[in-house]
Amino acid sequence: MDDLIARHYNFTGKFRKVHKDPGLKADSVVFIIVCCFIILENVLVLLTIWRTKKFHKPMYYFIGNLALSDLLAGVVYTANILLSGANTYKLTPTQWFFREGSMFVALAASVFSLLAIAIERHLTMLKMKLHNNGKTCRVFMLISTVWFIAAILGGLPVMGWNCIDSMNNCSTVLPLYHKAYILFCTTVFSVILMAIVILYARIYALVRTRSRKLVFRKVANGRGSNKSSEKSMALLKTVIIVLSCFIACWAPLFILLLLDVACQTLTCSILYKAEWFLALAVLNSAMNPLIYTLTSNEMRRAFIKMLNCGVCVQPSGKFSRPIMGAEFSRSKSDNSSHPNKDEPEYSPRETIVSSGNITSSS
């Protein structure tokens, strides 16, 4: 047993006698099963993107990076559970930092990937075109930056930002972490959350504004249509799903960590239930593949085809009409009367903003 870890756990009230915690509890087994599901679904998403040449585009690379980070979250959370309980006191401080730091890296990479997707979608809406050509290097540089920042963020405690020499500043949730570090991470994640909310709100506002302008133009030409408002409502539903899921999974953990910083040692009993809040954040890694990939008709079709035949998927050349509430087609609402060529300022390129990707076909 490592005396330093035991002292910190005892000081924060988390110390457990080894003989009282001999093995996995029922909730830990449930968490591991959920992690296995997370790993499986994200592996399938990665295989779908890898096997489908149509998905070898910047936006799908971001989706793939999100799946990779979520897959890693499932793996490291499983390892975290197996190394917890009585096994905690068998770890050296460095091993403990790697156990917890790997969780921070995986979850940070997942959150940063969500931000990267929101930024890419927003840029696409501003420029009204996709970055399909000549931008692969930029995309991979951005993905590399995501992982670099996540690794630095997760590695700060093992580099020295910890409370080994100042026990009074120790976190209750993570007894070797300094409260200042917990506050820093919570602030970073909260800023990212706000940025994602703002970006999706702007995406909706941009689409809504352009749809209204086109409706007014059509009404003036005697060609009124309610398709634009229907598509705007579809996008609004999608944005609400994306943001609600993200906030519901992450906000409780953010609040708990803020309580951890504010509370004195042994005063907040809710801090000893942190595993449930962390599990909820990890659950977001199970929801992301459903929200960001399977709501796309093309990805869902490729996904199912791969499961059925296990061979390289070759989707059809054209994207089908998106389902209501899952995808939003700007040009289909903006150009529903496209055969009439009296609106030259709008490109014939079709841009689909799904709940997790933006694709185009010409």
Curated annotation (Swiss-Prot):
GO terms for molecular function: lysophosphatidic acid receptor activity; sphingosine-1-phosphate receptor activity. It is found in: Cell membrane. The keyword Lipoprotein applies. Residues 352-362 have a biased composition (Polar residues). Glycans are attached at N10, N169. One of its GO terms (biological process) is negative regulation of angiogenesis. Keywords: Cell membrane, Chemotaxis, Disulfide bond, G-protein coupled receptor, Glycoprotein, Lipoprotein, Membrane, Palmitate, Phosphoprotein, Receptor, Transducer, Transmembrane, Transmembrane helix. Residues 48-61, 118-139, 204-238, 292-362 are cytoplasmic. G-protein coupled receptor for the bioactive lysosphingolipid sphingosine 1-phosphate (S1P) that seems to be coupled to the G(i) subclass of heteromeric G proteins. Signaling leads to the activation of RAC1, SRC, PTK2/FAK1 and MAP kinases. Plays an important role in cell migration, probably via its role in the reorganization of the actin cytoskeleton and the formation of lamellipodia in response to stimuli that increase the activity of the sphingosine kinase SPHK1. Required for normal chemotaxis toward sphingosine 1-phosphate. This is Sphingosine 1-phosphate receptor 1. It comes from Danio rerio.
